[in-house]
Amino acid sequence: MPMFTIHTNVCKDAVPDSLLGELTQQLAKATGKPAQYIAVHIVPDQMMSFGGSTDPCALCSLYSIGKIGGQQNKTYTKLLCDMIAKHLHVSADRVYINYFDINAANVGWNGSTFA
């Protein structure tokens, strides 16, 4: 059930159509979770600043049931910052990623929860 969200001030027209699918596949590989459970949400055209500058930036969140913590987060950060730089042209030093390890009982899907 990993959910990855990117809020960015990059305009929608500059977001490649392929990015959703590529993020899904790369997150599936990195987390070891099936692609069919991974959700990606890109929110472009946001009024944002980072360090007082409105140059391209991104504020991101990765939620997952497990697979969050320590070295895993460093691996995800490298992967995601590289992809954001490649596809959205946002420098890695203008990206924050917050990680959330969610209890399975607190995630609803398909009429129930994952617990």
Curated annotation (Swiss-Prot):
The organism's place on the tree of life at top rank: Eukaryota
The cross-references to InterPro entries, in alphabetical order and at most eight, read: Macrophage_inhib_fac (IPR001398), Macrophage_inhib_fac_CS (IPR019829), Tautomerase/MIF_sf (IPR014347)
What reaction is this protein's catalytic activity?
A: 3-phenylpyruvate = enol-phenylpyruvate; L-dopachrome = 5,6-dihydroxyindole-2-carboxylate
Q: Which Gene3D superfamilies match?
A: Macrophage Migration Inhibitory Factor (3.30.429.10)
Annotated substrate binding sites:
K33, I65, N98
| Gene Ontology terms: cellular component | cytoplasm; extracellular space
Q: Name the catalytic site residues.
A: P2
Keyword annotations for this protein? Cytokine, Cytoplasm, Immunity, Inflammatory response, Innate immunity, Isomerase, Secreted
Which top EC class applies here? isomerase
The entry's localization annotation reads: Secreted; Cytoplasm
- Please state the protein's primary subcellular location: secreted
Q: Answer whether the UniProt record assigns the keyword Isomerase to this protein.
A: yes
List the GO molecular function terms. cytokine activity; dopachrome isomerase activity; MHC class II protein binding; phenylpyruvate tautomerase activity
Report whether Secreted shows up as a keyword of the record. Answer: yes
Provide the family line. Belongs to the MIF family.
Task performed by this protein: Pro-inflammatory cytokine. Involved in the innate immune response to bacterial pathogens. The expression of MIF at sites of inflammation suggests a role as mediator in regulating the function of macrophages in host defense. Counteracts the anti-inflammatory activity of glucocorticoids. Has phenylpyruvate tautomerase and dopachrome tautomerase activity (in vitro), but the physiological substrate is not known. It is not clear whether the tautomerase activity has any physiological relevance, and whether it is important for cytokine activity.
Mind telling me what this protein is named? Macrophage migration inhibitory factor
User: Which species is the source of this protein?
Assistant: Gallus gallus
